[in-house]
């Protein structure tokens, strides 16, 4: 039996589903972010180039998205129509458990990174959806400062790297490393599947088990994420790039951060007081 974590509730006027996975990276190559993009580029049951885009155009969804955080990746959907909800849930389940991207490198090259040369006399450039997205994100000084703070505070932890990917590191990600990370983390024993709404929960769980979970063998090794220990040496200074039109004077940034315990511990402490 597969010991996936399943949560169900019947309290909402719209039906919701989420598949979430613990995905703490070891580097800033953006593997978590790239997997989030590529699994939505076609799957075994839905071998379309961009089923996510088709769902955005053709479904009655009230919410449809995917997101990568520091140590988890989630795929939530919601709809007020029963049939539409089931289609959304099935599409997302097939995307995370049977993506084409682990069999065909094209989605990885498209969403992650690839070399591009349109004419023989042009300079060789790097392109990719996630690569370009993170170039824009990391052009912000605020983003650079945030990344630097985490890098310094959690130097020897996955929390000290950029889970979205740093443009300087993304080209270091190989297709083999991408597949290895997917197979290790996208397993039912490392998943949290959530059903929420006014639905027949048992029939939905039976569908999920029959179509997906039953094909996996239990490994008995649920991934554990250890709470990081922040460094005490907090004083650090680093330069950042500015444009030719900017002045160096009065253009410095300073950040102050505090390492706090888990929010549930803070809540318990406040309640005790």
Protein language model regions, located:
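Short, small-residue-biased leader/transition segments that mark boundaries at the very start
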Residues: 1-7, 11-13, 270-273
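Catalytic Zn2+-binding segment of zinc metalloproteases
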Residues: 38-44
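A common structural junction motif
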Residues: 93-102, 212-219
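Non-catalytic beta-strand/loop surface segments
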Residues: 8-10, 14-26, 45-83, 105, ...
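Active-site recognition of the HExxH zinc-binding catalytic motif
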Residues: 29, 33-37
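Hydrophobic or amphipathic alpha-helical targeting/insertion segments
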Residues: 85-87
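Helix N-cap motif at beta-to-alpha junctions
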Residues: 81-83, 198-201
């Amino acid at each position: 039996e597969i010991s996936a974590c399943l949560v169900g509730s019947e309290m909402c006027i719209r039906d919701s589903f989420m598949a979430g996975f613990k995905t703490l990276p070891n580097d800033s190559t953006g593997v978590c972010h790239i997997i989030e993009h590529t699994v939505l580029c076609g799957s075994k049951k839905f071998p379309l180039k961009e089923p996510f885009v088709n769902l955005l155009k053709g479904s009655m969804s009230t919410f449809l998205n995917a997101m990568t955080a520091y140590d988890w990746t989630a795929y939530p959907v919601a709809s007020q129509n029963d049939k539409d909800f089931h289609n959304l849930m099935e599409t997302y389940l097939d995307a995370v458990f049977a993506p084409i991207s682990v069999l065909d490198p094209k989605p990885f090259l498209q969403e992650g990174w690839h070399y591009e040369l349109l004419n023989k006399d042009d300079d060789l450039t790097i392109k990719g959806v996630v690569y370009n997205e993170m170039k824009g994100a990391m052009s912000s000084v605020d983003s650079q400062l945030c990344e630097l703070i985490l890098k310094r505070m959690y130097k020897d932890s996955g929390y000290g790297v950029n889970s979205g990917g740093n443009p300087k590191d993304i080209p270091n990600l190989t297709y083999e490393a991408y597949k290895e990370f997917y197979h290790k983390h996208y397993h039912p024993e490392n998943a949290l599947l959530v059903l929420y709404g006014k639905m027949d929960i048992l029939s939905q769980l039976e569908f999920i088990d029959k179509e997906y979970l039953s094909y996996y063998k239990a490994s008995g090794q649920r991934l554990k994420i250890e709470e990081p220990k922040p460094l005490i040496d907090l004083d650090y200074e680093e330069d950042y790039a500015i444009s030719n039109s900017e002045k160096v004077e009065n253009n410095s940034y300073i950040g102050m951060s505090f390492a706090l315990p888990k929010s549930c511990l803070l809540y318990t402490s406040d309640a005790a007081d």
